[in-house]
A protein has these predicted regions:
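Extended charged/polar low-complexity repeat regions
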Residues: 1-372
Length: 372
């Protein structure tokens, strides 16, 4: 597939804003042609992504979307202001501090209340305000953060370390219980103690950070072993039983031996795919699969030869399932990709409705009865 990324400069966005103001009969707002060259995050050249188009799809060459897959709108200061989905509907909006560029003071999911944020002089969030739900306040002290919700429930986070190695080592929960965590010198989890005082220990590999051993509060241990590609090759449980895995030269799983000794083998017919075309279990039963170029399951044949086929649309969503004896199920979606109907071979249809936020609000059964 080929995609076209539409980029805009600050000068282009400024001119577009001026033209929109003129055509609307309003006074053009202050929209600078350039942005400050440097920010605390590095150099800013003012270039922003405004849209992503699908321009070529070998699976659906004659059925390309007539609109962008996603669009972005920006403020005069180059801050992300709005996000539109593939249906053209606005799904996110952001508001920023007038004084501090890039500091978000409000965020809204379409159809939901606007969440607002307040900050202290150090740029830390002190309040998160939700007009239709729980709001939170944050109080910062050295190695301690107190979080209080609008029902006056309080949690306290105790921290250790500095900058990127700062970790929460103790948490006082609203119900009075306390949990604790321990970390090594590079910030990797070494132990967790629950509210009852029971400690689980973790042993990460010094180089990779992968967990090599877990010891539960009762002293029982599980061990994990990896190859040089960091793939799990063996896992031994507290009972001493072992799970083993083998991989081919491309790193694909080709055999798994369960703790009970049963072996499952995986076969591949495409050197460029990590999706198996067949599996064989310990009884010799064989299952086969076919996949699309995008990794979507197209067919599955079980050990008795029973075939199930799957259809997908250009967005990768499943549109139909075809089983033996002509039994099929069809699925329909709206422009936002939400499931709106499921119909079987006999024409029995179940429909689904959503609100503007994308929440499921009603299910209409084939007999017309409505739930929701």
């Amino acid at each position: 597939r080929h995609f076209r990324l539409v980029l805009t400069t600050q000068a282009q966005r400024a001119e577009e804003a001026r033209q929109q103001a003129i055509s609307g009969g309003t006074e053009p707002s202050a929209f600078p042609d350039t942005l400050p060259g440097y920010t605390e995050y590095g150099r800013d050249n003012g270039i922003r992504l405004s849209a992503v188009w699908l321009t070529h799809d070998p699976e659906y060459p004659e059925n390309l979307p007539a609109a962008p897959l996603v669009r972005y709108g920006w403020t005069p200061r180059g801050e992300l202001a709005v996000v539109y989905d593939r249906s053209g509907k606005q799904v996110r909006s952001f508001t920023y501090d007038d004084k501090y560029r890039g500091r978000m003071v409000a965020h809204r999911h379409t159809g939901r209340p606007e969440i607002r944020y307040r900050y202290d002089s150090d740029g830390r969030v002190t309040e998160q305000l939700n007009p239709a739900g729980l709001s939170y306040t944050y109080q910062y002290e050295k190695d301690r953060i107190t979080i209080t919700d609008s029902l006056d429930r309080r949690e306290v986070l105790h921290t250790q370390g500095e900058a990127g190695l700062k970790r929460v080592v103790k948490k006082e929960h609203a119900d009075g219980s306390v949990t604790q965590s321990q970390f090594d010198a590079v910030g990797r989890l070494r132990a967790q103690t629950d509210a009852a005082g029971r400690t689980t220990e973790y042993s990460p590999d010094v180089v990779t950070g992968l967990i090599t051993r877990i010891t539960t509060p009762d002293g029982r241990a599980s061990a994990f072993y990896y190859n040089h590609h960091n793939q799990l090759t063996s896992a031994t449980g507290p009972d001493g039983l072992e799970l083993r895995r083998e991989y081919d030269e491309l790193g694909r799983l080709i055999q798994e031996t369960a703790p009970d000794g049963d072996i499952t083998r995986y076969r591949y017919d495409n050197p460029h795919s990590d999706l198996p075309c067949a599996t064989e279990d310990a009884t010799g039963s064989r299952k086969t699969m076919t996949w699309s170029r995008y990794g979507q399951l197209l067919s599955f044949t079980d050990c008795s030869g029973y075939v199930t086929r799957y259809d997908h649309d250009r967005f990768g969503q499943m549109t139909a399932v075809h089983r033996e004896e002509g039994l099929s199920q069809y699925r329909a979606y709206d422009s936002r990709g939400q499931l709106i109907a499921v119909k079987d071979t006999q024409g029995h249809e179940t429909r689904y409705e959503y609100n503007i936020a994308g929440d499921l609000t009603a299910v209409i059964a084939p007999d017309g009865s409505r739930n929701g």
